[in-house]
């Protein structure tokens, strides 16, 4: 099949590999992007990307918290100019506020009443599109709650209160001091913003992701030419490293890299004054998995794609 310049560009962004390596990988895998990333990794050309997905959309992430709950919403716009508009920012805040009164799914939020209005969130967004003159999309919504404890929040590089390009929620169950729990929770949320973990615990990592990593590590190890029993130990070691990199509680804590997040939680229990448990987290980065149409492309990539 013919490999396009856009495919080469996308694979370069996903893998960090060179142009010609990306073109070869796409040719070997018939243009299958995920398979091409794996092909590059097996060759030792590309590193694992912990969460596939390109960030290409404009808009804002909004966060609102109240009592024992907090929500994240993502609303996309066509341009950053509109995202910096006060009207658009108010819409994101109000949609997040509306989400607090629901179970958090996008359907439930769309059907709920927009704050201070008799119209639904969905109808209000449609009206705003006509007013602003640019399309906007309510892309996703998520809510975390605790029975007793806190849901800490963090917005990275906020453009206004509760609004930015990346947002995180962290649920901590504890009967202890809520102020201390919230302070630690914010540190964990900042850590999550920086490290983008796949899961809370090793048991939470998707089995297909584990099998994929094992297959790639096995292929890499076999290229060493070592005996099968040595290869098995090499794979076990690389899988341990994989879990340390992608499991939140096993990651080195950004605030103190000498200890894990789990160990930091144990330390935090001293100031919290009671046992504490991180039960869930959610991380929204603006435009994850969304692509914009590219109207222009680098000449050397186009030349490479042509052959």
UniProtKB/Swiss-Prot annotation:
Pfam families: EF_TS (PF00889)
Domain of life: Bacteria
Region called Involved in Mg(2+) ion dislocation from EF-Tu, residue ranges: 79-82
GO molecular function: translation elongation factor activity
PROSITE patterns: EF_TS_2
Classification via CDD domains: UBA_EF-Ts
Subcellular location: Cytoplasm
UniProt KW Cell wall biogenesis/degradation keyword: no
Signal sequence annotation: none
Keywords on record: Cytoplasm, Elongation factor, Protein biosynthesis
InterPro entries in alphabetical order: EF-Ts_dimer_sf, Transl_elong_EFTs/EF1B, Transl_elong_EFTs/EF1B_dimer, Transl_elong_Ts_CS, UBA-like_sf
Function recorded in the entry: Associates with the EF-Tu.GDP complex and induces the exchange of GDP to GTP. It remains bound to the aminoacyl-tRNA.EF-Tu.GTP complex up to the GTP hydrolysis stage on the ribosome.
Name used for this protein in its record: Elongation factor Ts
């Amino acid at each position: 099949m013919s490999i396009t310049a856009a495919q080469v560009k996308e694979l370069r962004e996903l893998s960090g590999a060179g142009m010609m390596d990306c073109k070869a990988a796409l040719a070997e895998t018939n243009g299958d992007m995920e398979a091409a990333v794996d092909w590059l990794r097996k060759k030792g050309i590309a590193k694992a990307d912990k969460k596939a997905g390109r960030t290409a959309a404009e808009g804002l992430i909004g966060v609102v918290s109240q009592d024992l709950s907090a929500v994240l919403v993502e609303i996309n716009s066509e341009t950053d100019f509109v995202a910096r508009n006060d009207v658009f920012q108010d819409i994101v805040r109000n949609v997040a506020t509306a989400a607090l009164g629901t179970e958090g799914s996008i359907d439930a939020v769309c059907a709920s009443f927009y704050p201070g209005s008799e119209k639904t969130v969905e109808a209000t967004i449609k009206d705003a599109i006509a007013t602003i003159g640019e399309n906007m999309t309510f892309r996703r919504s998520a809510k975390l709650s605790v029975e007793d404890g806190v849901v800490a929040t963090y917005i990275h590089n906020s453009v206004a209160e509760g609004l930015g390009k990346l947002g995180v929620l962290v649920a901590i169950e504890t009967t202890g001091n809520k102020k201390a729990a919230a302070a630690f929770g914010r540190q964990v949320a900042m850590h999550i913003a920086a490290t983008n973990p796949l899961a809370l615990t090793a048991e939470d990592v998707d089995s297909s992701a584990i099998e994929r990593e094992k297959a790639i590590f096995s292929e890499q190890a076999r290229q060493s030419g070592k005996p099968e029993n040595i290869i098995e130990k090499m794979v076990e070691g690389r899988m341990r490293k994989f879990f340390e990199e992608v499991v939140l509680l096993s990651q080195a804590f950004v605030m103190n890299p000498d200890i894990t997040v789990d160990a930091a939680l144990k330390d935090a229990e001293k100031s919290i004054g009671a046992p504490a448990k991180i039960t869930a987290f959610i991380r929204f980065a603006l435009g994850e998995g969304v692509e914009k149409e590219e109207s222009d492309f680098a000449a050397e990539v186009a030349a490479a794609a042509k052959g």
